[in-house]
Design a protein with these regions (language model features):
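Histidine/acidic residue-rich metal-binding segments in metalloenzymes
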Residues: 99-113, 117, 124-207, 220-236
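Active-site microenvironment of metallo-dependent hydrolases
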Residues: 1-37, 57, 61-64, 70-86, ...
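Alpha-helical scaffold segments that flank or form the walls of functional sites
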Residues: 27, 38-117, 122-136
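A generic structural signal for alpha->beta connector loops
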Residues: 39, 112-114, 168, 264, ...
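Positions that flank functional sites
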Residues: 92-93, 149, 249
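Short secondary-structure boundary/hinge segments and terminal tails
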Residues: 95-96, 152, 285
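Short, charged N-terminal helix-start/capping segments
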Residues: 11-20, 45-57, 74, 154-173, ...
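Short secondary-structure boundary segments
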Residues: 89, 146, 244
């Protein structure tokens, strides 16, 4: 079925512009400023701001989670406008990787939204073998836990880089050391960044926050954008709608969306409304696992390392 999302506000170059979307078979077929000459059913969205469906990070899910607990945790994300989840599997020993990833995939069969798989392991567990197993399991995101006592310079980074060659794997620094002051945490991150840049390893240069939308820049680096995290022709219909009158604005007119204070009025996943004013439609099994074919897409080569 074709219909038109008419005159919805979209953020472009730090300001809101009105655009009109032609939707066909739950995909965006056409976008332009107006489509007054096209005769299809219209939805007047002139009082709304549209954003892409959010991709969010989660460390809390685990394979032994009962369905009702799993459902409640996922609903928290749906209320925030999340339409794709980056779920992280904790790996203590390399031999656990295959079985733990398999268990997480079994848990996510019930997911109502799309999801990407990632693993988290300690620095001492990071080696060529574990990265090859990640490739075999089609896992392209690896969180590396680093703490104050870790000696980053003692890791065989040259071997790590060789194992990542031609693999769409991105390393992400992570720390759970609560004893670290913000200053020491920043020093630890600086040391990580120095090492991965020196060895030209595909990595993020910041710690990521759970339960908040991942930025466009992060999604680009991971290889998730533009399939997710963008409103563009050809993409599936994953979006959030916010009432313009409920938003706060910067002096320059750019809207402020504080995700801990305001939730989207509507959320669509693949063309199906799953959030209407906080009322959640939980459809088990409607989500699909997504895979990353190329990391760092649409990033200039000079900015990749």
């Amino acid at each position: 079925m074709c219909y038109i999302m008419d005159k919805v506000g979209i953020l472009k170059s730090d300001r809101i512009e009105q655009t009109t979307l032609l939707v066909n078979q739950n995909k965006i077929e056409f976008m332009r400023q107006s489509m007054d000459n096209i005769k299809f059913m219209r939805m007047d969205l002139s009082s709304y701001l549209i954003t892409p469906g959010y991709v969010m990070l989660d460390f809390s899910l685990h394979s032994l989670l009962p369905f009702q607990d799993f459902k409640q945790q996922i609903i928290r994300y749906l209320k925030k406008g999340c339409t794709s989840l980056l779920t992280v599997v904790d790996i203590k020993y390399e031999k656990e990787l295959v079985s733990n990833v398999k268990k997480r995939r079994h848990l996510m069969i019930n997911s109502p939204i799309d999801y990407f798989m990632a693993v988290k392991l300690s620095l001492k567990s990071l080696n060529q073998s574990v990265l090859r197993k990640c490739k075999q399991q089609q896992v392209s995101i690896v969180f590396v836990e680093i703490n104050k006592d870790d000696r980053l310079d003692l890791t065989s980074w040259g071997w790590i880089r060789d194992a990542m060659f031609s693999n769409p794997i991105t390393l992400i620094p992570f720390t759970s050391d609560e004893s670290l002051s913000p200053f020491k945490k920043n020093r630890l991150l600086q040391e990580w960044n120095r090492i991965v840049r020196e060895h030209r390893i595909s990595s993020l240069y910041e710690f990521l926050e759970e339960g908040t939308p991942l930025s466009k820049e992060i999604l680009m680096k991971l290889g998730i954008y533009p399939v997710k995290g963008d409103i563009r022709v050809g993409n599936k219909l994953n979006y959030n709608l916010y009432k313009l009158e409920e938003l706060k604005y910067h002096i320059d007119g750019k809207p402020i969306i504080q995700h801990n204070e305001i939730s989207p009025t509507f959320t669509s996943h693949n063309g199906k409304l799953i959030n209407i004013n906080g009322n959640i439609l939980f459809l088990p099994g409607k989500g699909e696992e997504c895979f990353i074919s190329i990391s760092g897409r649409f990033i200039p080569q000079s900015a990749s390392f």
